[in-house]
Amino acid sequence: MAPGEAIVSVSYQSTTGVSKQLSLEVTVISPFSLTTDVFNPSIWENGTFDEATRTLVTGQYGFGGWQYTDGLDLSGYKTLTVELGNDNESNVSFRLFDKTSYWTKPATYDFGSSRKVVIELNRMIDENGVKIDPSHLYIIGFWSMGGKPIVIANITLAD
């Protein structure tokens, strides 16, 4: 389900044959919300995040992003596209961890001189060639050398 508005309908019939129906309007949010209550600029080292400009500045060798206590299941999607809104001046990479510790080996995608990375979620591997499981991702975000702004333009999932 894509971010936006949706109507959820619930129907129920009791054992005595009484039927009830309820429709709810819900807001579907992205698992990659760029709000200060969800985005953590200081997963490793002290960073800052400006919600209005979508700008992350990590500490030296820092990491900012999202943490999912129960894991995030992206196995139903084919790709994750991450786009920067400025040039990469601090060796920015996008990393996805399928374990709860930051000190494990993630799938790493370097931006290099590009402003965009496209991640094939079912083909993620770590630096040793070990598969990263998209069905339970615990930490996802941006690593950098630090001290330079990283403008997050867009993060999209596609199936």
Q: Predicted regions span which residues?
A:
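Beta-rich carbohydrate-recognition modules and glycan-binding surfaces
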Residues: 25-159
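Extracytoplasmic soluble-region selector
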Residues: 1-31
